[in-house]
Swiss-Prot record:
The chain crosses the membrane at residues 5-25. A core subunit of photosystem II (PSII), probably helps stabilize the reaction center. Belongs to the Psb30/Ycf12 family. Signal peptide: none annotated. GO terms for biological process: photosynthesis. It comes from Chlorokybus atmophyticus. This is Photosystem II reaction center protein Psb30. Keywords: Chloroplast, Membrane, Photosynthesis, Photosystem II, Plastid, Thylakoid, Transmembrane, Transmembrane helix.
Length: 33
């Protein structure tokens, strides 16, 4: 695997993981847990 492919996969995985995390953090800040 090339470094470019690994970099793209890591960026995609971070975006996919950051999606739900941002929603959870926003809900926690609003106290809607």
């Amino acid at each position: 695997m090339n470094l470019e492919v690994i970099a793209q996969l890591t960026v995609l995985s971070l975006i996919v993981l950051s999606g739900p995390l941002v929603i959870i953090l926003l809900a926690a800040n609003r106290g809607n847990l």
